[in-house]
UniProtKB/Swiss-Prot annotation:
Keywords: Ribonucleoprotein, Ribosomal protein. One of its GO terms (cellular component) is cytosolic large ribosomal subunit. Residues 1-14 have a biased composition (Basic residues). This is Large ribosomal subunit protein bL35. It holds the Pfam family Ribosomal_L35p. Residues 1-48 are annotated as: Disordered. Residues 21-36 have a biased composition (Basic and acidic residues).
Amino acid sequence: MKQKTHKGTAKRIKVTGSGKLRREQANRRHLLEGKPSKRTRRLKGTEDVAKADTKRVKRLLGRA
């Protein structure tokens, strides 16, 4: 039977053309009034998935 893509992971992580895994930063959804502007600016954009997690994430995405 074919392996299914883990949809929760697929919604959160994008694969770049070179095969890198990118994810959104945490802590920027709500309760932003109490966080300094400096912190919220730093949390903009995307970040690479941790090296320790890449193998597991690729398997969930069906790219292992």
